[in-house]
Amino acid sequence: MIRVELPYHLRNLAQVDREVSLVVDGPVTQRAVLDALETTYPMLRGTIRDHTTQIRRPFLRFFACSQDLSHESPDAPLPAAVVAGEEPFSIV
């Protein structure tokens, strides 16, 4: 299970708590996590990434293991602690 922390406005929109748990099939990347998040919570589609380009919205940042991953490739593997569920993938 991958843990994802959401900011207040996205929590309100999805009607969830601060942290959600997701099952991600295949390699755990930003793209895979966001795809799983948008599949589980369709009301979040287009709020984190642009509908057409799938590029991160400029007002959001991605963090994991105290690292800013916002400018990393969306297909780069996430840190092992995130994959193991020890640390959350944070959307700020």
Show where each model-derived region lies.
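Ubiquitin-like/PB1-type beta-grasp interaction modules and other compact soluble beta-rich domains
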Residues: 1-92
